[in-house]
């Protein structure tokens, strides 16, 4: 798998740690938190989101070129890190969007303090454990298998040939580091927080839950759970789509976000 960067990359310092920051657009602030595989073929800073919002899209600490704080071990730690970042950047009444693991971080942030969050969008988010289905074990399979699991029909994904190409040695090292950090954050318990469902009932922020119906990594059952646990949530499920609707069904995703 080849890793893709966005077109608007710079650097920011949060609590003394340097992170990659991708920023573009104009309008009210929107914070986009990527999944474990990064942004893939979807660059939020060059998407229709940047036509309505000033989009902030950081690379998570320990991912890509962002520094890895020694104290950061859990998704809850990462949520606190981003709460600090929001404060340091002075973001007011921002829209919070998260995909996969980024959606889990977003849900944790909203559960901590939702008063400064104008809107919440969870895209095929980790964080809750399905009652009937299973979350696929992504740490025990190859990168090629993970990539195939991520899409229902790869032919629908713009530039799929780019992300499916063999990585350079540098890209392979970055990908390995990303997975190492992901396992550090999400291994136990695996890709969920058993306490999170109990916190979500206090989140009054309007929420949109977007899910690919054929998600082979985190089943749509989890999207249904989020839409029930969040008091003001709407579920938008997208047919013939896997784990990353913003990549596999960009038109339908953008319509849902409009």
What are these regions (language model features)?
Residues 203, 209-211, 215:
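Short beta-strand/loop motif that positions the catalytic acidic residue
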Residues 241-254:
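Catalytic histidine-centered segment of alpha/beta-hydrolase-like enzymes
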Residues 131-132, 136-137, 144-205:
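Conserved alpha/beta-hydrolase catalytic His-Asp/Glu region
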Residues 227-244:
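Catalytic histidine neighborhood in serine/cysteine hydrolases
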Residues 104-112, 117-150:
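Flexible "cap/lid" loop of the alpha/beta hydrolase fold
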Residues 216-222:
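Conserved alpha/beta-hydrolase "acid-adjacent" motif
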Residues 14, 56-97, 255-258:
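Active-site loop/oxyanion-hole signature of alpha/beta-hydrolase fold enzymes
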Residues 13-67:
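Conserved HGGG/HGGXW glycine-rich cap/lid loop of the alpha/beta-hydrolase fold
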